[in-house]
Amino acid sequence: MDAYELVTRNTAEIVTEDELRALLNKPTKRVYTGYEPSGEIHLGHLVTINKLMDMKAAGFDVVVLIANLHAYLNRKGTFEQIKELADYNKACIEAVGLKGAEFVLGTDVQLTPKYQTEVLTLCQQITLNRATRSMDEVGRAMDNPMVSQMVYPVMQVVDIPTLNVDAAVGGIDQRKIHMLAREHLPTLGYKPPVCIHTPIVNGLDGEKMSSSKGNVVSVADSPEEIKKKMKKAFCPPETEGNPILQIFRYNVFPRMDTIAIRRPEKFGGDLEFHSYAELEAAYAGGKIHPMDLKAACGDALTELLADAYAYVQSYKN
């Protein structure tokens, strides 16, 4: 798999493909994703973490913004509460597999006069309506938003040149914010970033993923908890929108070469798959029972998250 295939696999959109190809030819290139400290790192985060790992393998320097100031503006707690969670999330991101990245705490770079001046300059250009729509897109629909929450997307735009990155990775829900960056950063004298958008995956019940709903698997889940969640998970005969198949596609196969489906001989014996396409075809053809697929998914996730779970236990103890 060449660098372009590695970067673009399991993506929903690349803006733009030509710009990405040109960027890949440069000897030095930087990419970032920002994570607002909030709760446990879970499979939703792992989609973009895996993409950052792909990009590191493709020759990018990877920057992770731990967006504590964004979290504060989004009313997620006091600075002290958010700082503790930021340190914890950073360690979990590393433990889940992202090694050698540069981690930047938001307040270390976002309170300078230059940064704040650029935010205020863009506030003169971006309408309130457009800022609101961009926040709605990332799942923060608000009937009565605070001014601080409207500054949030503008800050995300300024984060890109502040971190000196060439590309931004995010879920497809970040698209409107990234398009703001591509449109408005040239007015400040900066090049528009290449944007790599990943799909938004479903929760275990087939609905929108939400920690509050309990339809996610996180790094804090024990092997027993993962097994229990898999048993209850929605796994329809169809492949479209199937949360278990999505986990295999976006979380498991990017990190594991072979997946085993363990079955008694009377049910056909064990099966091995070396690609997601093989697994999906077998499931679509009725060759794998949903319970067997879910059990294999639980085993794979337990292995994949073992180091992160061990860190969580040591942190809590």
From Swiss-Prot:
Catalytic activity entry: tRNA(Tyr) + L-tyrosine + ATP = L-tyrosyl-tRNA(Tyr) + AMP + diphosphate + H(+)
Signal peptide start-end: none
Amino acids binding L-tyrosine: Y32, Y152, Q156, D159, Q174
MF annotations from Gene Ontology: ATP binding; tyrosine-tRNA ligase activity
Cell compartments where the protein resides: Cytoplasm
Residues annotated for ATP binding in this entry: S211
Gene Ontology terms describing biological process: tyrosyl-tRNA aminoacylation
Entry keyword annotation includes Aminoacyl-tRNA synthetase: yes
Gene Ontology cellular-component terms listed: cytoplasm
Listed EC numbers: 6.1.1.1
Motif 'HIGH' region in this chain: 37-45
Keywords for this protein: Aminoacyl-tRNA synthetase, ATP-binding, Cytoplasm, Ligase, Nucleotide-binding, Protein biosynthesis
Family of this protein: Belongs to the class-I aminoacyl-tRNA synthetase family. TyrS type 3 subfamily.
Function in brief: Catalyzes the attachment of tyrosine to tRNA(Tyr) in a two-step reaction: tyrosine is first activated by ATP to form Tyr-AMP and then transferred to the acceptor end of tRNA(Tyr).
Matching NCBIfam families: PRK08560.1 (NF006330), tyrS (TIGR00234)
Subunit annotation: Homodimer.
Protein name (record): Tyrosine--tRNA ligase
Organism listed in the record: Methanocorpusculum labreanum (strain ATCC 43576 / DSM 4855 / Z)
Gene name per UniProt: tyrS
